[in-house]
């Protein structure tokens, strides 16, 4: 080994102080060796208070000016305006984790931050970047190899999945989820295929304002919170559906146009031509066998009268999400004009279902391969409905993961503490750079249950000391609860193995990439010929650079 590289015995001594336990004053603060660390720390500081079942909510103001109260890390990451490339990379990893596994976004962000902080200390201790990267990769492989041995529970093929979904759904809402968990478990169980496969798209979710969460129920088919327009409200058999992303009425072209009318006769002719065009369009829909039209736009009264004349049920969708989901389920395109689709959607019947003071429109099938059940959510506030809807989707995703791999591991930070103990034991015996890297990885893993305890309002040092002692004694089922440490088996707090493993892979990919980055170089465009020679331009430069320059990006707080 090179003489400039500290020995394996020197590194642990130089890493004795955890960076979180040795605060510095601003004057004493050293520059980061990892250029991406500050950006990752800032991003994690936004997500950290939302981690776990006791995480706090945030008022999120979107680009459209809409205010949303949420504790969902995925929604927060999606709404943030980021400039730093490392923050972009971490957000992409978190969103990929959510899309592929349905959960674990905050886990990815926080563990990445903790590992990079430990990597910074290893670099300051003199460990070269290539050896650090190799040691971290070895530790990740050790974690992934050990993880299946912690799976002490498994969902049976004929078992009610409520107990397995309970902790997943309760993590993402402030309301009690017992009733909703049973509904989701029933829906998932009912549409599970005989071969054990499960299609998440066969479970619909419909949110109706009004009532309470206990009023939520299951409806057969696919239900949406659309508005029925006109006199036609039901198709009892042979429904053929067309979807339109436009007003149900006269077209409104984007380009402005002015009709030049010189006499009352011209005005009458213009109005007559418009009416004839609308009647022709509605007649074409009826001739193609369309008896249900779902529109995302305004509904014209005269056009609605024509639809009643031809026996067409007109439904006004309330959101893009509903009509896009209908397009996917019915396998019919979303049309920009009132034209018959080449492939209309088909279902057995369409009818309205009254639920207290709410109204749902139900599309029902009798054949296989289509949505069988819809979870209809009730709630007094929009924010409460959004939170419940998010919890339902997490439950559906969790059941989908369990159908692929039914194994479950302890939750509430118990798995992270067990893995940290394993890495600490091995790291203390290993020689070379792998030993300190294993110890650093163990420190990073302990950061997750520490965050759970902090968000629960507990005495963090006492909880972590008690958990460490219990895990050292061999009890790997102890995690962080509301009032202290809990036995996760008795409390029923479980995580799916496949989601946790995917989360570790995502974290490893980001960390192994960022530890090799020393600086961020941004190409700067050279000024154009007009900008150079325009004397009135404020950006005029007498001597423009002949080549592109580079700019080192910092973090925009």
UniProtKB/Swiss-Prot annotation:
InterPro entries: Chaperone_TCP-1 (IPR017998), Cpn60/GroEL/TCP-1 (IPR002423), GroEL-like_apical_dom_sf (IPR027409), GROEL-like_equatorial_sf (IPR027413), TCP-1-like_intermed_sf (IPR027410)
One GO CC term, this protein: chaperonin-containing T-complex
Domain of life: Eukaryota
Keywords in alphabetical order: ATP-binding, Chaperone, Cytoplasm, Nucleotide-binding
Subcellular location: Cytoplasm
One MF annotation (Gene Ontology) recorded for this entry: unfolded protein binding
Region (Disordered): 1-33, 531-557
Keyword Zinc-finger: no
Pfam family, one: Cpn60_TCP1
Gene Ontology biological process: protein folding
The UniProt record lists the keyword Ribosomal protein: no
Family of the protein in this entry: Belongs to the TCP-1 chaperonin family.
Function: Possible molecular chaperone; assists the folding of proteins upon ATP hydrolysis.
PANTHER family reported for this sequence: CHAPERONIN
Extra remark: Presence of two highly similar CCT8L genes (CCT8L1P and CCT8L2) in the genomes of human and chimp and of a single copy in other mammal genomes, including rhesus monkey, suggests that the duplication of this gene occurred in the ape lineage (Hominoidea) after its divergence from the old-world monkeys (Cercopithecidae). Expression of CCT8L2 is confirmed by many ESTs mostly identified from the testis.
Protein name: T-complex protein 1 subunit theta-like 2
Lineage per the UniProt record: Eukaryota, Metazoa, Chordata, Craniata, Vertebrata
The gene coding this protein: CCT8L2
